[in-house]
């Protein structure tokens, strides 16, 4: 990287460090480590660059960086300390001096208690149990949840783990996100029903399922889990507990705007109300909002797709436009819009299942490159097509699932073929 005097702007150091994640190798690692060790400055550009470097080194899996990252635990930059604790967790640090410092950070640094608990528990530092235990009574949900999860992980006593699920219904969305991570960290499969019902992004729920089940055989995926996955992918609003409510019934204009809310609880609540509104009333404002904004807003994009599939009395003209949107969404490869692809398949299956069936040959040509939730949703959609002749249905499901190595796709296909 260039010297400070050669930088074109304060963000150049940071930008260079961020881009080096794409250049793995010894030279990259040495350059980043040297910056951490020898670049001393109180200016903000150096501080934020060091935070990024610590993250990049961890993502590169650079074990040689542990000594340099560990020294950052004594920094007066709390954000650098936070990133360093996380990085040492990722790199599986076993340096006792650094571990002692992380325990001290937990005792005295109120800004980094959650990440410190997570790190010590993940590294299985048994001597941290007595330090972590009192935090189970913290008034801060994210710290309390991490402590309960950490103690369960370290002691194998899971008695208090269900308490974490209470945080899934807190008004603050970040607290709900923390709760899901805390349940993932302790492999709380018995709390999956609570996770499925939580008003959070479906992506978080999918991650919880995948991390808790790991690479287990499809034979351990039971019908209850498949039913929950079906509800998740089809955005079954009756299965979601919203933590917000309206004082009075809002206008349709207000509800459409709430589909852009960053809190999924509010999005789901708006969806519940809009799904019972007249299709002729809300379609013009939905179309206008989609064209102006929602088509390029990945959160709202998903909510609009779910809404399109939850209303069945669209006019013929409205349906033609909606079908175009759904077909475009199914083939949308932009990473941030991936959760909308499975939702679009299920929405199209509800509104026009024969149109989806016509797409199957094209879909099969790119099946192996599709994300697992999309492949799952295709099988779910065909299975739910009651008017489809049984032999043709089974043929399609077999084609969609043949040689698929994903345990959930396998299990869903087995259920469909057995019915």
Swiss-Prot record:
Protein origin, superkingdom: Bacteria
Described by its record, this protein's role is as follows:
Involved in the biosynthesis of bilin.
Keywords, sorted A to Z: Antenna complex, Phycobilisome
Q: Where are the transmembrane segments?
A: none
InterPro entries for this protein: ARM-like, ARM-type_fold
Q: What is this protein called?
A: Bilin biosynthesis protein CpeY
- SUPFAM superfamilies named in the record: ARM repeat
Task: Provide the Gene Ontology terms for cellular component.
Answer: phycobilisome
Whichever gene encodes this chain, its name is cpeY
């Amino acid at each position: 990287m260039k010297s400070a005097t050669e930088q074109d702007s304060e963000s150049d150091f940071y930008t260079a460090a961020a881009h080096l994640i794409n250049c793995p190798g010894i030279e990259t690692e040495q350059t980043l480590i040297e910056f951490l060790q020898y670049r001393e400055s109180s200016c903000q550009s150096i501080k934020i660059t060091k935070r990024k470097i610590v993250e990049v080194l961890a993502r590169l899996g650079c074990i040689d960086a542990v000594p340099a990252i560990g020294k950052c635990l004594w920094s007066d930059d709390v954000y650098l300390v936070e990133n360093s604790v996380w990085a040492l967790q990722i790199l599986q640090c076993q340096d006792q001096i650094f571990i002692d410092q992380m325990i001290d950070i937990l005792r005295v640094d109120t800004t980094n208690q959650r990440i410190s608990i997570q790190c010590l528990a993940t590294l299985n530092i048994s001597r941290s149990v007595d330090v972590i235990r009192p935090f189970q009574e913290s008034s801060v949900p994210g710290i309390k949840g991490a402590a309960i999860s950490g103690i369960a992980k370290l002691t194998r006593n899971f008695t208090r783990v269900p308490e974490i699920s209470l945080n899934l219904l807190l008004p603050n969305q970040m607290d709900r996100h923390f709760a899901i991570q805390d349940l993932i960290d302790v492999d709380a499969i018995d709390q999956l029903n609570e996770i499925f019902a939580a008003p959070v992004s479906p992506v978080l729920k999918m991650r919880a399922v995948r991390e808790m089940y790991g690479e287990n055989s499809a034979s351990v995926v039971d019908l209850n889990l498949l039913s929950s996955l079906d509800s998740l992918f089809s955005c079954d609003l009756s299965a979601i507990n919203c933590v917000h409510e309206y004082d009075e019934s809002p206008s349709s204009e207000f509800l459409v705007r709430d589909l852009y809310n960053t809190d999924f609880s509010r999005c789901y609540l708006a969806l519940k109300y809009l799904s019972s509104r007249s299709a002729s009333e809300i379609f013009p404002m939905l179309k206008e909002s989609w064209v102006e904004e929602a088509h390029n807003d990945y959160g709202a994009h998903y909510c609009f797709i779910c809404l399109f599939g939850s209303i069945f009395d669209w006019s013929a003209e409205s349906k033609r436009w909606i079908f175009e949107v759904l077909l475009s969404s199914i083939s949308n490869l932009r990473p941030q819009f991936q959760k909308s692809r499975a939702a679009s398949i299920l929405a199209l299956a509800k509104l026009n299942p024969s149109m989806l069936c016509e797409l199957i040959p094209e879909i099969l040509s790119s099946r192996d490159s599709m994300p697992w939730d999309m492949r799952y949703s295709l099988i779910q959609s065909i299975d739910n097509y009651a008017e489809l002749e049984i032999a043709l249905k089974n043929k399609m499901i077999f084609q969609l699932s043949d040689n698929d190595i994903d345990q959930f796709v396998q299990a869903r296909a087995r259920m469909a073929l057995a019915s």
